[in-house]
Swiss-Prot record:
InterPro entries: Cyt_b/b6_C, Cyt_b/b6_C_sf, Cyt_b/b6_N, Cytb/b6-like_sf, Cytochrome_b, Cytochrome_b_C_euk/bac, Cytochrome_b_N_euk/bac, Di-haem_cyt_TM
A GO molecular-function descriptor: ubiquinol-cytochrome-c reductase activity
Taxonomic lineage: Eukaryota, Metazoa, Chordata, Craniata, Vertebrata
Official protein name in the record: Cytochrome b
Note: Heme 1 (or BL or b562) is low-potential and absorbs at about 562 nm, and heme 2 (or BH or b566) is high-potential and absorbs at about 566 nm.
Family: Belongs to the cytochrome b family.
Location in the cell: Mitochondrion inner membrane
Membrane topology: Multi-pass membrane protein
């Protein structure tokens, strides 16, 4: 008798994606982040759904409704802090996932990579709009500053900003539409995840060596499902103490002050996971130039496959490229630190230097180093 999981129209799709999927036998723990991101997305949708049952998207009551969730709803504080810190965990996994792709040359699967970039933009948009919802000081001013950047677009900028605001300033209409989009976008993200997996399963997974792994494949279940479960437990071990002991560690204290359009906070900054892009934005004195640099800091990932000059796919056997990769990581940490600092000397020049280095490493140094390594291979 044939197994039902191989014959049932629905089960056979799940089977070919999560059970009998052939996977390279050499996958390291860096391949765990895809499944961790799936878990993060599930947790965010579930906690967000229950939070939405108690939240009101009105400027007069939004702040109080979040307070009500934390104080009066059964385990509301847990839902709220799981959702807020779950977003941080989501971005940690997301950045590590992208970093893994850069290091091991996974970007050569261009369809999967490009859908991944779309996913990154969608998740960033979702997180930005979610940060506005508690309607604290940083929510309001963050929304004002970031949406105002669109006014740098020639001709249509001002009208575009007012169209997004639904008026002449960030107000009730803005909050309502941000809530609507914040609720909708995770489902669009889920659909994009399915497309991402569809393209990935067309080619099969990359592996740490970068060599074709067709002769040496193993089924995903039980080998990698067990490995993924270990990954979930490790992530939970990191997330639980954060949520239960230091839930506000990664947040901004200003967001516990209700939004006040007449008082500007001394330092307006986004959540920590956007600080690197915010530092790049601030490092350029011109508004339009800053906005372009901000968009390019993420969009540059789309041209990484074109810039791949090496004869080897992975960086595993390319020590010079490895040094550059870790320099890029150091630059990103520096940018994240600078993004949270006030705009004054010496932070300005450090931010500008790090921003220039970020683009130089990706656009110039990495391709050049690859060509040097290709030359050294002939020796």
């Amino acid at each position: 008798m044939t197994n039902i999981r191989k014959t049932h129209p629905l089960l056979k799709i799940i089977n070919s994606s999560f059970v009998d999927l052939p996977a390279p036998s050499s996958l390291s723990s860096w391949w765990n982040f895809g499944s961790l991101l799936g878990v993060c997305l599930g947790v965010q949708i579930l906690t967000g759904l229950f939070l939405a049952m108690h939240y009101t998207s009105d400027t007069a009551t939004a702040f109080n409704s979040v307070t009500h969730i934390c104080r009066d709803v059964n385990y509301g504080w847990l839902l709220r802090y799981l959702h807020a810190n779950g977003a941080s965990m989501f971005f940690i996994c997301l950045y590590l996932h992208v970093g893994r792709g850069l290091y091991y040359g996974s970007y050569t699967y261009s369809e999967t990579w490009n859908v991944g970039i779309l996913l990154l933009f969608a998740v960033m948009a979702t997180a930005f709009m979610g940060y506005v919802l508690p309607w604290g000081q940083m929510s309001f001013w963050g929304a004002t500053v970031i949406t105002n950047l669109l006014s740098a677009i020639p001709y249509i900028g001002t009208e575009l900003v007012q169209w997004i605001w639904g008026g002449f300033s960030v107000d009730k209409a803005t909050l309502t539409r941000f809530f609507a989009f914040h609720f909708l976008l995770p489902f669009i993200v889920t659909a994009l995840v399915m497309v991402h997996l569809l393209f990935l399963h067309e080619t099969g997974s990359n592996n740490p060596t970068g060599f074709p792994s067709d002769p040496d494949m193993i089924p995903l279940h039980p080998y990698y499902t067990i490995k993924d479960i270990l990954g979930f437990l490790v992530m939970l071990t990191a997330l639980a103490p954060l949520v239960l002991f230091s839930p506000d560690l990664l947040g901004d204290p200003d967001n516990y002050i209700p939004a006040n359009p007449s008082i500007t906070p001394p330092h307006i900054k986004p959540e920590w996971y956007f600080l690197f892009a915010y530092a790049i934005l601030r490092s350029i004195p011109n508004k339009l130039g800053g906005v372009l640099a901000l968009v390019m800091s993420i969009l540059i990932l789309a041209i990484v496959p074109i810039l791949h000059m090496s004869k080897q796919r992975s960086m595993m056997f390319r020590p010079l490229s490895q040094c550059l990769f870790w320099l890029l990581v150091a630059v990103l940490f520096t940018l994240t630190w600078i993004g949270g600092q006030p705009v004054e000397h010496p932070y300005i020049i450090i931010g500008q230097t790090a921003s220039v280095l970020y683009f130089l490493i990706i656009l110039f140094f990495m391709p050049m180093t690859s060509m040097v390594e290709n030359y050294l291979l002939k020796w």
